[in-house]
Amino acid sequence: MNYFRYKQFNKDVITVAVGYYLRYTLSYRDISEILRERGVNVHHSTVYRWVQEYAPILYQIWKKKHKKAYYKWRIDETYIKIKGKWSYLYRAIDAEGHTLDIWLRKQRDNHSAYAFIKRLIKQFGKPQKVITDQAPSTKVAMAKVIKAFKLKPDCHCTSKYLNNLIEQDHRHIKVRKTRYQSINTAKNTLKGIECIYALYKKNRRSLQIYGFSPCHEISIMLAS
């Protein structure tokens, strides 16, 4: 599939703009200025449209290629501000720290937590161990999951110490000061950020970190 058909700009310009935004803490205006210094005049609103178009595509391609996971999961949520109000980004990683999935919700309750865990089980199968914080909503959700999917009663572990890994894994989200103006904008952008970060972590664990290029990774994904 040609993802760059009918585009005014060369695909290399688009992949650089999208890759820089999703990997680094740059604004759309920053990227517009970087491209201008290299002789390419792109308005910051165009960079925004590219990110909104390609970020969810990259995320779906990445998900199709990563369907395996270690059977110990860590699940947590972090806060995202959208139009001045807090929303909640549920995130999950496996025992090796690889990203499993994300889900942005307006509410932090047992229904949201249950739906997210159910979605993970549908993707990766039943886990042997699920580590979470001690939030009451998560405990209720896990009790429902254990009953619905007939998991071992002791598969749920609520440990602050053991859950530190995923709390540290939130840093690439928290370091950004992005002000999202809609839930859809936030969803699309965060999907792209998580996709590139997941690829970065995979390269880091395979000792290839010094050769990591978000633009190169995007080019490979969109060429497949």
UniProtKB/Swiss-Prot annotation:
It comes from Staphylococcus aureus (strain Mu50 / ATCC 700699). SUPFAM superfamilies: Ribonuclease H-like. One of its GO terms (biological process) is DNA integration. The lineage of its organism: Bacteria, Bacillati, Bacillota, Bacilli, Bacillales. One of its GO terms (molecular function) is DNA binding. Pfam families: DDE_Tnp_IS240 (PF13610). Residues 33-52 bind DNA. Involved in the transposition of the insertion sequence. Transmembrane segments: none annotated. This is Transposase for insertion sequence-like element IS431mec. Keywords: DNA recombination, DNA-binding, Transposable element, Transposition. Residues 73-222 form the Integrase catalytic domain.
